[in-house]
């Protein structure tokens, strides 16, 4: 997959940052020595961490060069590194691991979550939020269009870019033996957007990328036209003309 686009992602910065704020509010660590923002993106979540813990050494970690470029422009005093969390280990004395909307992209992510919790010192925290929206029309329709001609050959594997998330009980059973406390919850957002085209713009920043990146300009235009038409049918306008993008997310905070 091509690099992520920070510009596209930030078109809905307020809406994308809200889950990070709500996750952070449930982290009880008062004075961490070091904090790592895993999947920091363009630095919007990192900024929250710096504001919450100005005395801590906060680093951002991401695989995207474009996201990291934007993060460094936003927070020039902070350290950002390019790394894949599947092969990355936190620096010693890291007391908070914060991961907003990243682990859904990591294969076998439960294994890595267990590794990260196990490496925390007593009182440290792993805080995670992941979109749980593969069964929403926005994502069902991506796959539906991709499995049709003329895109089937190129996009047959795109639907495999993200696995369905396990049930909350699976996370609980895997992580609870490794920590002193585990909080886990779901939140369903209903984001108010202008129209179906705005929903498409939203998912172009993240979930739609594996479907459109393999296509050339002409193919991409045709795919997006077919997808947008189905999104418009699945998300009818409200009385004022706006549409509601239903967006479930799972959260958990593990305290060592």
Swiss-Prot record:
GO MF term set: trans-aconitate 2-methyltransferase activity
CC per GO annotation: cytoplasm
Subcellular location: Cytoplasm
InterPro entries: Methyltransf_25 (IPR041698), SAM-dependent_MTases_sf (IPR029063), Trans-aconitate_MeTrfase (IPR023506), Trans_acon_MeTrfase_C (IPR023149)
Pfam families: Methyltransf_25
Spans through the membrane: none
Keyword S-adenosyl-L-methionine: yes
Single GO BP term: methylation
Keywords from the named record: Cytoplasm, Methyltransferase, S-adenosyl-L-methionine, Transferase
Catalytic activity: trans-aconitate + S-adenosyl-L-methionine = (E)-3-(methoxycarbonyl)pent-2-enedioate + S-adenosyl-L-homocysteine
EC number: 2.1.1.144
Family label: Belongs to the methyltransferase superfamily. Tam family.
Role description: Catalyzes the S-adenosylmethionine monomethyl esterification of trans-aconitate.
Name of the protein this chain belongs to: Trans-aconitate 2-methyltransferase
Organism this protein belongs to: Rhodopseudomonas palustris (strain BisB5)
């Amino acid at each position: 997959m091509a690099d992520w686009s920070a510009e596209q992602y930030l078109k809905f910065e307020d809406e994308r940052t809200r889950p990070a704020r709500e996750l952070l509010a449930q982290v009880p660590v008062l004075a961490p020595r070091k904090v790592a923002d895993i999947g920091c993106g363009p630095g919007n979540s990192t900024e929250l961490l710096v504001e919450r813990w100005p005395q801590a050494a906060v680093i951002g970690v991401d695989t995207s060069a474009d996201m990291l470029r934007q993060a460094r422009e936003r927070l020039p005093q902070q350290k950002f590194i390019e790394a894949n969390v599947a092969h990355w280990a936190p620096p010693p004395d890291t007391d908070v691991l914060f991961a907003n909307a990243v682990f859904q992209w990591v294969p076998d992510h439960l294994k890595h979550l267990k590794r990260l919790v196990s490496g925390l010192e007593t009182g440290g925290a792993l805080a995670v939020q992941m979109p749980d929206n593969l069964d929403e029309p926005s994502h069902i329709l991506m796959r539906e269009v991709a499995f049709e001609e003329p895109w089937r050959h190129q996009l047959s594997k795109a639907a495999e870019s993200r696995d369905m998330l396990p049930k909350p009980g699976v996370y609980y059973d895997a992580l609870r033996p490794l920590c002193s406390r585990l909080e886990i919850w779901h939140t369903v957002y209903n984001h108010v957007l202008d129209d179906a085209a705005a929903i498409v713009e939203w998912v172009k920043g993240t979930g739609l990328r594996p479907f459109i990146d393999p296509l050339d300009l002409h193919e991409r235009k045709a795919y997006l036209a077919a997808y947008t038409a189905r999104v418009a049918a699945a998300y009818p306008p409200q009385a004022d003309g706006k549409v509601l993008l239903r967006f479930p997310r799972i959260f958990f905070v593990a305290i060592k």
